[in-house]
A protein has these predicted regions:
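Bacterial carbohydrate/catabolite-sensing allosteric modules
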Residues: 6-354
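Catalytic-core segments of nucleotide cyclases and related cyclic-nucleotide turnover enzymes
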Residues: 331, 566, 611-618, 626-629, ...
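Amphipathic HAMP/coiled-coil signal-transducing linker helices
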Residues: 355-356, 505-526, 538
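Catalytic core regions of nucleotide second-messenger enzymes
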Residues: 303-308, 591-592, 621-637, 670-673
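Helix-loop-beta substructure at the N-terminus of cytosolic sensory domains
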Residues: 359-408
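Amphipathic alpha-helical "output/dimerization" segments
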Residues: 476-496, 502-510
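Conserved long alpha-helical elements within nucleotide-processing catalytic cores of c-di-GMP signaling
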Residues: 525-548, 555-585, 591-595, 599-600, ...
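A short, aliphatic-rich beta-strand micro-motif
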Residues: 451-460
Length: 673
C-alpha cells in the first residue's frame, strides 16, 4: 500500500474512533428520553344486571395486566326483556356512543345482555370495524369465542343432589325460555335425573326470566301445591335462587330442612346469604385473565385460540344441607363487622341522592345548574370519587324547543357535548370541557402510568339520549352494597324534571311576554306598564337619577279614521310606534297607553336626553311623510316632565303631569292650523 493510501486509511480509522467515542459520551451525558408507551384501550359492553360477573371478569383482567398496559371502558345498559321498548332503546344507545375503531379490542358479554341478538350485533359490528372482539357465552363466527361450560358444573350439582341428598322430586326455575344458557342448564339437570331413573316432568319446569318478580310468584305457587314442596328447587341463576329462598322463608319454611334451593353463578350475594347457596361457579375471574393474556398475545403478533372453553364447577354451600359444621361462620363474622357501617353508607348515599335530586329539580336555568353542581361536588364527592363526569349535549337544556330525536342524532354526530361537571384525578371540579365520540372522558390521559377502569352509563328520556355519566371503576359507589344504578337513575329523573322546569319557565315567560305586549304595535300594553314602569321609577329613586315621563299622541286621529278609513288609522298608530321604537333607549320602556296615546318612561341625567328623543321621533315621523306612501299626513304632539331632586311624587302624578303638558301642546297645534 502506498504512503498516500496509508495516510487516508489512518485518517478514516481515526475519524471512526472519534465519532464512536464521542457518541458514547454524548449518550451518557444526554441520554435519549424514554418514549412513554401509550396504553391500549379496551371497550367492554355489559348489562348492569350482570354486575357481579363483570366485576369478577375485571378483577381477573387487571390481575393479568401486570404492566398496566390497558385502560378499560365499560359501557353499561340496564335494558331487559321486561322493560318498555322505549326505555330499552335509550339504554342500548350507550353501545352506539363509542367509535369502535378507537379501541384496541372489545369484550362483549353476549350471554348477559338484554337479548342474544344485541350481543351478536355488537360482535359483528366490531368484526366489520376490524377490531379484535371477544364474545362471552355466545359463539359468533370471526370472534374470539369464550364459551362457558354450563354442562360440567350443572352435572356436578345434579349428581350431588341425587347421590348425597337423595333428591327425587325436583322443580327447575329457568331464565328466559328461549335463552340458550337457560335451555342448556335445564336440559343438563333433566338428563342427569333421567339417567338416575328420576325423570323431571315438563310441568315442573318454570321460567323466572332471570329476575325476582316472576320467581317470587313461582315460589308462592310451589308453596301452595297440594303435593307439597319438592325435595329441591334448582334455579338457573343465583338471583332467582335468592328470590325463591327469601319468599319461602317469608312464608314460614326453613331452608334447607323443608326444601333445598340451589343456584348458578356464584355471586357474592349468594355467599353472604343464610343459608349460603350451593351453586355453580362459571369462573369469570379466569375469563378476565384469559381475555387479557389473549389480547396481549394477539397484539404482539402471536397465534391465538379462537374458541376457548371455560369450565364451570360445583360450589357446595349450606342451602343443600351440607356444610353445617360452621365452615361459613368465620365469613359471616367478617361480614357482620361491616353490617352497620354499610348501612350508614347507604343512609349517607340516600341523603346525597335526595340533595342532588332537589338541587337539579328545583333549577330552571342551565347556567345555574352547572354552578350548583360544581359547588355541590366541590364540597362532597366521597362516594363518586375522582374521574367522575356528567357529560351532556347542552342543547337539550338550552334549547327547550329542540326536537329530542335531533338532540340524540346531533350528539352522536360529534355534536357539542361537554361536561356539566367533572371531577379530575387531582380532585379539581370543573365544568364545560368539550368531548366527542373519540374522546369520551374529560381529561383522559392515555400516557399515564396507571391502568384505569371507567364505567359509562346512558342518560336518556325514553328512547332519546342527551348524555352519559362516567364513574371510576374503583369508586366507593361501585361497591356491592351500594346501588350505583339507582344513583344514575335519580340523575335521569332529576334532569327530566329540570328540563320540564326550563320548558315551563320558557312557556310562562312567553305567555307573560305575550300578555304584556300590544299586538298591533309591539310596545308594552297596560299590563306591561304595570309590570315594567314601577321598577324603573324605583330604580331612579334609589340611584338618584331623574325620572323622565313623556306622552306622545297622534294629532287628528279621528279625521284619519273618518276620511281614510280604520285601516289607515291603524297604519298611523303603527308608524308612530315604529318611530318611538327606533329611537328608544334600551333602558327605557314605551307603552301604548290608549288608542293613539303612547307613554315613554326612563331615567335621564337632564332634560337634554328627553328633548333629543322627542326630536328624533319627530324626525322619523317627517321621514314617513316625506316617503309619501300613505294618503294621510302624520303628526304627533308630545309633552314630558323630568323629576327634580328630592321629589317624592308617586309615578301616577308624573304621568298625569306629562299628559297635561302633551294636551297643552296638542291644543296649541290645533289652534295654529
Amino acid at each position: 500500500m502506498c504512503k498516500y493510501c496509508k495516510e487516508r486509511v489512518s485518517k478514516v480509522f481515526f475519524y471512526i474512533c472519534y465519532v464512536f467515542i464521542h457518541r458514547s459520551v454524548i449518550k451518557a451525558v444526554y441520554p435519549r428520553p424514554k418514549v412513554r408507551k401509550m396504553k391500549k384501550k379496551i371497550a367492554v359492553f355489559a348489562n348492569g344486571y350482570g354486575l357481579d360477573s363483570l366485576k369478577a371478569l375485571l378483577k381477573g383482567f387487571r390481575s393479568a395486566d401486570v404492566n398496566n398496559e390497558y385502560d378499560i371502558f365499560v359501557f353499561f345498559s340496564y335494558a331487559s326483556y321486561d322493560e318498555f321498548d322505549e326505555f330499552n332503546r335509550g339504554e342500548l344507545n350507550i353501545y352506539d356512543l363509542p367509535d369502535l375503531k378507537d379501541y384496541d379490542a372489545l369484550i362483549v358479554l353476549s350471554n348477559s345482555l338484554n337479548s342474544i341478538e344485541t350481543g351478536i350485533t355488537l360482535v359483528k359490528r366490531a368484526i366489520e370495524a376490524g377490531v379484535p372482539v371477544f364474545s362471552i357465552g355466545i359463539e359468533v363466527e370471526g370472534a374470539i369465542n369464550l364459551i362457558l361450560d354450563n354442562v360440567s358444573g350443572m352435572k356436578e350439582l345434579a349428581k350431588h343432589l341425587i347421590e348425597v341428598h337423595d333428591v327425587k322430586r325436583v322443580a327447575i326455575i329457568g331464565g328466559y325460555k328461549t335463552h340458550p344458557e337457560s335451555i342448556c342448564r335445564i336440559d343438563t339437570v333433566r338428563q342427569v335425573f333421567e339417567e338416575h331413573g328420576r325423570p323431571i316432568p315438563e310441568e315442573n319446569i318454570y321460567y323466572g326470566d332471570w329476575g325476582n318478580l316472576k320467581t317470587l310468584e313461582i315460589a308462592k305457587h310451589l308453596a301452595e301445591d297440594p303435593a307439597g314442596l319438592p325435595d329441591a328447587i334448582i334455579a338457573c341463576n343465583d338471583i332467582m335462587a335468592l328470590a325463591c329462598s327469601t319468599e319461602l322463608t317469608r312464608l314460614g319454611y326453613t331452608l334447607p330442612d323443608d326444601v333445598i334451593v340451589t343456584g348458578f353463578d356464584y355471586v357474592p350475594k349468594g355467599q353472604a346469604f343464610y343459608p349460603v347457596l350451593t351453586t355453580v361457579d362459571t369462573d369469570f375471574t379466569t375469563i378476565g385473565k384469559v381475555c387479557c393474556n389473549t389480547i396481549t398475545d394477539h397484539l404482539n403478533g402471536k397465534a391465538i385460540e379462537m374458541h376457548i372453553l371455560i369450565n364451570s364447577k360445583l360450589m357446595v354451600g349450606e342451602s343443600c344441607g351440607c356444610c353445617r359444621d360452621g365452615l361459613f361462620d368465620e365469613r359471616r363474622r367478617e361480614q357482620g363487622k361491616t353490617t352497620y357501617s354499610d348501612a350508614l353508607d347507604r343512609e349517607s348515599l340516600d341523603g346525597s341522592e335526595r340533595a342532588l335530586t332537589q338541587l337539579i329539580s328545583y333549577t330552571d336555568e342551565y347556567g345555574e345548574l352547572t354552578k350548583k353542581l360544581v359547588d355541590y361536588y366541590s364540597g362532597e364527592h366521597d362516594f363518586v370519587g375522582n374521574d367522575f363526569h356528567i357529560v351532556i349535549y347542552g342543547k337539550y337544556f338550552t334549547d327547550v324547543m329542540a326536537d329530542e330525536q335531533e338532540v340524540f342524532e346531533d350528539a352522536l354526530d360529534d355534536g357539542p357535548m361537554q361536561s356539566i361537571v367533572s371531577i379530575g384525578s387531582n380532585d379539581e371540579v370543573t365544568t364545560g370541557t368539550p368531548v366527542s365520540r373519540h374522546d369520551l372522558i374529560p381529561g383522559y390521559n392515555r400516557a399515564d402510568t396507571e391502568s384505569h377502569v371507567y364505567f359509562l352509563f346512558p342518560l336518556h328520556t325514553g328512547l332519546y339520549n342527551y348524555g352519559y355519566v362516567v364513574v371510576n371503576g374503583d369508586a366507593r359507589i361501585t361497591r356491592e352494597y351500594l346501588d350505583l344504578h339507582a344513583y344514575v337513575e335519580k340523575f335521569m329523573l332529576a334532569f327530566r324534571i329540570q328540563r320540564s322546569n326550563i320548558q315551563l319557565k320558557f312557556y310562562n315567560d312567553s305567555l307573560r311576554k305575550i300578555s304584556e305586549i300590544d299586538t298591533m304595535t309591539g310596545l308594552y300594553n297596560r299590563l306591561g306598564y304595570e309590570n315594567k314602569a314601577t321598577p324603573i321609577y324605583d330604580n331612579c329613586k334609589r340611584s338618584g337619577s331623574r325620572l323622565m315621563v313623556m306622552f306622545i299622541d297622534i294629532n287628528r286621529m279621528k279625521r284619519i279614521n273618518d276620511v281614510f278609513g280604520h285601516i289607515n288609522g291603524d297604519a298611523a298608530i303603527r308608524l308612530t310606534a315604529s318611530a318611538i321604537k327606533t329611537n328608544l333607549r334600551e333602558d327605557w320602556i314605551a307603552v301604548r297607553f290608549g288608542g293613539d296615546e303612547f307613554l315613554i318612561i326612563g331615567g335621564v341625567k337632564n332634560k337634554d336626553a328627553a328633548e333629543a328623543f322627542r326630536s328624533d321621533v319627530l324626525a322619523s315621523v317627517d321621514r314617513f311623510n316625506h316617503e309619501g306612501a300613505w294618503p294621510f299626513r302624520l303628526s304627533v304632539s308630545s309633552g314630558f316632565i323630568i323629576s327634580e331632586e328630592g321629589d317624592d311624587k308617586p309615578l301616577t302624578e308624573y304621568i298625569k303631569d306629562a299628559d297635561n303638558l302633551m294636551y297643552e301642546t296638542k291644543k296649541k297645534m290645533h289652534s295654529e292650523k
